[in-house]
């Protein structure tokens, strides 16, 4: 089953950290097929200003594709909000009615795909911790390696960005920190 994380009520605080990093938070659906392994997931992710999806806002959605022959391509347009959604639903209903009793080519297979365990995927992580940065600095450096501390002007907490590691490695290290308030993935590559 595909894992998902939803954007919660702490969005304002997360936005402050994103701004401090010169990044933007986007709800990102990812699907990657690398060396015979398939990964899919949905989660809020921090994107750099150079990423094509950085500036997608409002009722617009975008699909960013990295193809082996095509290279990078982005498809962009209305897709969120009540009018675009209603239009898509009506179009689907019309297509069903128009094709009643007909065989439509179906390219879907009955074979269930096995997805890569999310714990094996690699990213950087922005981690928010309750407390004072000075009290944790040495310990965090020892446990997580070379991190980038982030000052977002939020009272009583601080943040840091980890080096690239697997999600499983992050989860294991995070167990030693009950003070962790939140983690968000950082998308490094375009």
Segments (PLM) and residue ranges:
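Flexible loop/N-cap segments at domain edges
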Residues: 17
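Single conserved hydrophobic/aromatic residue that forms the stacking wall/gate
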Residues: 1-8, 12-13
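Short, Gly/Pro- and small/polar-rich lid/capping loops
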Residues: 32
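A conserved regulatory-domain signal marking ACT and ACT-like small-molecule sensing domains
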Residues: 93-190
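Catalytic, metal-anchored helix/loop core of enzyme active sites in primary metabolism
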Residues: 39-130
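Hydrophobic helix-and-loop "lid/oligomerization" segment in the mid-to-C-terminal part
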Residues: 26-29
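Secondary-structure transition/turn motif
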Residues: 11, 44-47, 164-165
